[in-house]
């Protein structure tokens, strides 16, 4: 009888750590991107909560007129926000150690940069983690490609736009009313509603909602009948059952008759690719549009483009939008400038649109 003795393999602490990090058996997959994602998102979240509750007012315009954004300084959930970094800081990197004191860092809006930069690192790492888990499981990589759309949109408003405009004070405030203010000022300065890429994004978001609702309702309505003709089809299945209940042929036939034949998909993979690609491409284009408007390549300008035979302007909706833009331009940063350049550089415009004289 021969006995064979084998030396038991011993794994170092590092090897066991690597195995645990990359294991797909964990309840929540961590991955190497998760090693970066977890601390950055925890930092951004904790700083955001503290700043939203207790941050002191921030000198956003750099003119020694602080703006309060936290709950402890009189705001509520709707009006509260983390105020962007001061215009006096510009696009300089402004960590805590660059300030002379913590009070100075808070006064100049340092928490905004800390939150935004950690958040962008965190969501980019989350996107990489989606790819990493797909790779480990032998899946295709399209989940992370789809998530790149909201990552691109967040990067556009929080990073690219402030860089293009020369200051983090132009970034989107981290709050509800601050987001609305950002949207109104963006329209006033860049005419985003007249930008083709924004139009594509609107089509992507609303179209994606429509297609999602249509698809979900069709799937829910298309049952494989398990009952007789005299019983309701609803008795033939239980909510959440594992067995297939969806008949794509029936759904295809219904929708093809409702609209027309070629408006319906009879291939499940093509259908779901379309459902994913439509909103993703739309949001990609919107992010690209915001990134170009960051450098003042703005939306279309059709102001005063229609004139009569005497050279008098016939106002169109473009002129109405332009007047609204000028009004918003005047209202924002009311103390940072004496007169907006958009008004100072053009000829004087009447406040109201003149109605034509009617001879009765």
Curated annotation (Swiss-Prot):
<keyword id="KW-0472">Membrane</keyword>
<feature type="binding site" description="axial binding residue">
    <location>
        <position position="118"/>
    </location>
    <ligand>
        <name>chlorophyll a ChlzD1</name>
    </ligand>
</feature>
<keyword id="KW-0602">Photosynthesis</keyword>
<keyword id="KW-0106">Calcium</keyword>
<keyword id="KW-0604">Photosystem II</keyword>
<feature type="propeptide">
    <location>
        <begin position="345"/>
        <end position="360"/>
    </location>
</feature>
<dbReference type="InterPro" id="IPR055266">
    <property type="entry name" value="D1/D2"/>
</dbReference>
<feature type="site" description="Tyrosine radical intermediate">
    <location>
        <position position="161"/>
    </location>
</feature>
<dbReference type="GO" id="GO:0005506">
    <property type="term" value="F:iron ion binding"/>
</dbReference>
<keyword id="KW-0560">Oxidoreductase</keyword>
<dbReference type="GO" id="GO:0009535">
    <property type="term" value="C:chloroplast thylakoid membrane"/>
</dbReference>
<dbReference type="Pfam" id="PF00124">
    <property type="entry name" value="Photo_RC"/>
</dbReference>
<comment type="similarity">
    <text>Belongs to the reaction center PufL/M/PsbA/D family.</text>
</comment>
<comment type="subunit">
    <text>PSII is composed of 1 copy each of membrane proteins PsbA, PsbB, PsbC, PsbD, PsbE, PsbF, PsbH, PsbI, PsbJ, PsbK, PsbL, PsbM, PsbT, PsbX, PsbY, PsbZ, Psb30/Ycf12, at least 3 peripheral proteins of the oxygen-evolving complex and a large number of cofactors. It forms dimeric complexes.</text>
</comment>
<keyword id="KW-0812">Transmembrane</keyword>
<keyword id="KW-0479">Metal-binding</keyword>
<feature type="binding site">
    <location>
        <position position="272"/>
    </location>
    <ligand>
        <name>Fe cation</name>
    </ligand>
</feature>
<feature type="binding site">
    <location>
        <position position="215"/>
    </location>
    <ligand>
        <name>a quinone</name>
    </ligand>
</feature>
<dbReference type="GO" id="GO:0009635">
    <property type="term" value="P:response to herbicide"/>
</dbReference>
<keyword id="KW-0464">Manganese</keyword>
<feature type="binding site">
    <location>
        <position position="333"/>
    </location>
    <ligand>
        <name>[CaMn4O5] cluster</name>
    </ligand>
</feature>
<keyword id="KW-0249">Electron transport</keyword>
<keyword id="KW-0148">Chlorophyll</keyword>
<comment type="function">
    <text>Photosystem II (PSII) is a light-driven water:plastoquinone oxidoreductase that uses light energy to abstract electrons from H(2)O, generating O(2) and a proton gradient subsequently used for ATP formation. It consists of a core antenna complex that captures photons, and an electron transfer chain that converts photonic excitation into a charge separation. The D1/D2 (PsbA/PsbD) reaction center heterodimer binds P680, the primary electron donor of PSII as well as several subsequent electron acceptors.</text>
</comment>
<feature type="binding site">
    <location>
        <position position="215"/>
    </location>
    <ligand>
        <name>Fe cation</name>
    </ligand>
</feature>
<feature type="binding site">
    <location>
        <position position="344"/>
    </location>
    <ligand>
        <name>[CaMn4O5] cluster</name>
    </ligand>
</feature>
<feature type="transmembrane region" description="Helical">
    <location>
        <begin position="274"/>
        <end position="288"/>
    </location>
</feature>
<feature type="site" description="Stabilizes free radical intermediate">
    <location>
        <position position="190"/>
    </location>
</feature>
<keyword id="KW-0408">Iron</keyword>
<keyword id="KW-0934">Plastid</keyword>
<keyword id="KW-0359">Herbicide resistance</keyword>
<feature type="binding site">
    <location>
        <position position="170"/>
    </location>
    <ligand>
        <name>[CaMn4O5] cluster</name>
    </ligand>
</feature>
<dbReference type="GO" id="GO:0016168">
    <property type="term" value="F:chlorophyll binding"/>
</dbReference>
<dbReference type="GO" id="GO:0009772">
    <property type="term" value="P:photosynthetic electron transport in photosystem II"/>
</dbReference>
<keyword id="KW-1133">Transmembrane helix</keyword>
<dbReference type="InterPro" id="IPR005867">
    <property type="entry name" value="PSII_D1"/>
</dbReference>
<keyword id="KW-0460">Magnesium</keyword>
<dbReference type="InterPro" id="IPR055265">
    <property type="entry name" value="Photo_RC_L/M_CS"/>
</dbReference>
<feature type="transmembrane region" description="Helical">
    <location>
        <begin position="118"/>
        <end position="133"/>
    </location>
</feature>
<dbReference type="GO" id="GO:0045156">
    <property type="term" value="F:electron transporter, transferring electrons within the cyclic electron transport pathway of photosynthesis activity"/>
</dbReference>
<dbReference type="InterPro" id="IPR000484">
    <property type="entry name" value="Photo_RC_L/M"/>
</dbReference>
<keyword id="KW-0793">Thylakoid</keyword>
